[in-house]
Amino acid sequence: MDRDGRRERPWIMRTYAGHSSPAESNALYRRNLVKGQTGLSVAFDLPTQTGYDPDSPMAAGEVGKVGVPIADLGDMRLLFEGIPLDTMNTSMTINATAMWLYALYAVTAEEQGVDESALQGTTQNDIIKEYLSRGTYIFPPGPSLRLITDMIVHTVEHAPQWNPINICSYHLQEAGATPVQEIAFAMSTAIAVLDSVRDSGAIPAERFGEVVARMSFFVNAGVRFIEEMAKMRAFVQIWDEVTLERYGVTDPKQRRFRYGVQVNSLGLTEVQPENNVQRIVLEMLAVTLSKDARARAIQLPAWNEALGLPRPWDQQWSLRIQQVLAEETDLLEYDDIFAGSHVIEGLVDRLVGQARDEMASIAEMGGAVAAIESGYMKSQLVQAHAERRARVESGEQVIVGVNRHVETEPNPMLADLDAAIQVVDAEVATQAIESVRAWRAQRDESAAQAALERLRADAQADVNLMAASLDCARAGVTTGEWADTLRRIFGEYRAPTGVTASIAAGVASDELSAVREAVQATGAALGTRLRFLVAKPGLDGHSNGAEQIAVRARDAGFEVVYQGIRLTPEQIVAAAVDEDVDVVGISILSGSHRELVPAVVAGLRAAGMNDTVVVVGGIIPDADAEFLRERGVAAVFTPKDYDATAIMGRVLDEVRAARGLASAAR
């Protein structure tokens, strides 16, 4: 308790939400706020995140699927209608287009009569980690760092209560990072950002503490909650050291490690999903038990996220978990209950020492941006993820219901699976397209073009782009127009995949050896080495699964072709034809499989590749899996299919069947 005997204030409670349309998302937000949620966390759809309007060919199949589509100021007005932005704390998970979405938000507040200085919230804006994990980057690292820097400089002056960046270790853990890598990579990114702001000369040295004070972090918390809690204390210690020693920030309040958290969605299972509830609770303890390292904001995933899009009731359940812990227990009545624990202190010391060593290695490479451009960080994550997968497959790392205690009674919550998840209406895309076209038709076109011309000129002149972006928002410019203008100046970027021939992750099982021998025998029978194209169609940048399939396919003896993320069906077909592949493995997590996968299959057949096997992996409901099989997909794999070697065996069987060969003995 505080000195007056009162309980500590709880953290900000959010649920990560947004889908279909601004109007539907607005209704969801208002319902959640009535239920006691104390902040908003906005999920945007992939076209919005990657800078495309709903009517762009690149947006096909993606509109409204994983978040809300925001194409213009009108959409942002609808999203926050009836929600006073002078009192709301809003977190926006947005990166490459963060400057633009913030501009739309600030102008919406302006129209509500709210001064920009009153805004409270966070833009994720950690474009650096997008090259390593989520994949929603647009521009090369240099221009991306400029956008981050420009926004930080602007908000320090004009929105002092806004967190202009959330350095994200969350996605690094999902991409495979160990706790040491999570700390070191995130801290190296923070150093790159702070160095850029300092070196810009836009913030006087005596005010640099204000920059540091608005830096925030977004972290992950896994089920090993003792180690995870020690990780958070290690973050606190290293951040305090870096900001004092490197940047000379003497005010302890400005050096405070401020972070929000979502617990580990990657660890949620499709099999026995009811077990996810206790996983979520245990993971939350990692970021709440230790007062000295407690999260300032928490959002919990829903129990059924491995099955599909959660319903409002599922999100309410996650909110109630937070409320029970904060309001029914005595958690907030005590000082740090782990202070002086030799076990915790030993864990923290080990993590701090190893993280410092890794940070020093990255610094020797030239810092985080250089370590990304060289492929070092990405290859380290792919390697660590492959090792984690190998531990799960061998049973060394236990996942209850998946590789141990698999016997189960029928789950009544899944009796009607279609009702257990929310489905986005197919008309959402049509409505969004009509909306953005109507918006363009009614705006002052000359004002919009003038604003875009200023944006173009400022980008070329190395002027801070925030003012021009605000002008664009007021003039009715669209998301795609803003991003396309900068694409023409900065160019687009394709990040290293991290998939290398040297990665084997210690996998040397009898099962893998048998599959490898069968792959080689099949190739000999067909007179060629079997070729496997791993493909990521659409705008889905979550490449972790695709990378692990590429690694295991190579270990199993296939010649692997993997060109990275964000490909059109036409590009995938062209690659399959050029490389004369035997298998096209499509990885897709955005819910756009019903639109994009049939387009790939049809393209392959039109190109005469009738014997090429198509398999699909992702979060795909049973009804959709049947839909895909009816359209020529040989096999569909979902999160329950955790054994990558078994997947390779099944793929080989499909190849042999397509070529008229009997199943291989293994």
Predicted features, each with a name:
Residues 36, 72, 113, 239, ...:
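Conserved, mostly hydrophobic/aromatic
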Residues 652-666:
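The C-terminal output helix
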Residues 5-13, 54-64, 85, 129-135, ...:
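Gly-rich Lys/Arg/Thr-decorated short loops/hinges at beta-loop-alpha junctions or inter-strand turns
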Residues 60-65, 90, 129-139, 172-176, ...:
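Short beta-alpha connecting loops at secondary-structure transitions
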